[in-house]
Amino acid sequence: MTETAYGNAQDLLVELTADIVAAYVSNHVVPVTELPGLISDVHTALSGTSAPASVAVNVEKQKPAVSVRKSVQDDHIVCLECGGSFKSLKRHLTTHHSMTPEEYREKWDLQVDYPMVAPAYAEARSRLAKEMGLGQRRKANR
């Protein structure tokens, strides 16, 4: 499309029609007698796109795969989107559902403190970190 300033919608429509027909004709063999019909068809098609028809969309709220209460088990968390069981939901939500934990909590009306990690898994990781000495201040070397 050219970089000209358009006065109104009709000028834009004519400009777009010309650009589309020119691009089409440069790559296809079109007899001269069919050119007015092609221009008319493209113009008509573009005219129909300027006023979108109003469509009433009735979207039902998605139902969770399991109840929120049953989704948090000691050894796993069940994804409300697909019903899969996981120790940690964050990576699954990102890769399979393109959601952040915040978006997930908002979609399913979950509490801000709804866990993204199974309780037993969180406890095991915490225990391992404490055994390694993480979270403690270093002793001064003197």
Curated annotation (Swiss-Prot):
Similarity section: Belongs to the ros/MucR family.
In the UniProt record, the gene name given for this protein reads: rosAR
Tell me which domain of life the UniProt entry assigns to the organism this sequence originates from: Bacteria
- InterPro entries (alphabetical): ROS/MUCR_sf (IPR041920), ROS_MUCR (IPR008807)
Organism lineage reads as:
Bacteria, Pseudomonadati, Pseudomonadota, Alphaproteobacteria, Hyphomicrobiales
Q: Mind listing the UniProt keywords for this protein, alphabetically?
A: DNA-binding, Metal-binding, Transcription, Transcription regulation, Zinc, Zinc-finger
What is the name of the protein in this document?
Answer: Transcriptional regulatory protein rosAr
What species was this sequence derived from? Rhizobium radiobacter (Agrobacterium tumefaciens)
**What processes in GO biological process is this protein linked to?**
regulation of DNA-templated transcription
Q: Please list the GO terms describing molecular function.
A: DNA binding; zinc ion binding
ZnF locations on chain (C2H3-type): 79-97
